[in-house]
């Protein structure tokens, strides 16, 4: 049974009802643009998102573009329906359209984000500002990838149809495993998927252009494109390390406003040694995921008698609740996890020496009492001067914003080209 996690849909705007997908001459599987684009149309749309409503002269100052260039881009984006003018906000005595403020025309449209987790799949509807309109969680279907993805697409289509006045523009899928962004094909060992046609099946099921990305890379992109902190931009040459931990662990690197996306797919930190005695499926002991994943922590809690045996496997929520309610053994097992995470982040930070480090995922955000232990272990293990290290501002919603940014990244990077794809 699906469980809504955010606010109920806002029924605004004037776009046509989301209908059963019509036949298309070809599928649009488009690699995501996990970067801050320097194109003029992208720059104008970005400043409209962050500062709108605003005038053209303010937009020119904010983007560094000439007034003439801003006028051309605003006119093009107005014609495409991505911007709207606010004549009601025109200063008294102002003459001519250049004085009329403009903003993102967010009410007629939505995008569909899908985060496919090992256990739960989240489906998210967002507007063009990157604001989440609503979200729903469904169990990730088990079995053959084609059947599972068809079911996910069906659920996503039904969910998006709740906003009957909004026109869906794009779908974005974020998930673990090895992702070929060009083709939308994914290998996901945890789900048993080999050459899963993620892009093709979701595009067919929704009748929309679709982009597919590795989920940790997408989380890093959400910090660049959707975080309030991103409004000030990224310093030239600035580097970042994004570290994620929950059921899996992973990292992504950002360089100069762009997520580094290796052509052969993201690397893995699953088997980094931690020194623990946890048995890994690879045959070794002490591998990172075998030590800190939700599944590993629950198993350790069961072995220690912290959580009761039952017909249904306990959840992390039960462990967090026990620790928050004063269970010293539950707290201790979460502290041990926090210490391993802190040491691992320190090792990676010393290796890459980025300008900033962002920690994301429920392993950090679900148990705030563990954060001081992450920080202490990090400080003890790192040999470099401390810089900007923080927890993601998206909190427990990092998965939602990861898929949201995949659904929006191409529109943000090339608004004109993206809108042409949506109408072809």
What is each PLM-predicted segment?
Residues 127, 181, 254:
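Short, acidic, Ser/Thr-enriched surface-loop or helix-capping motifs
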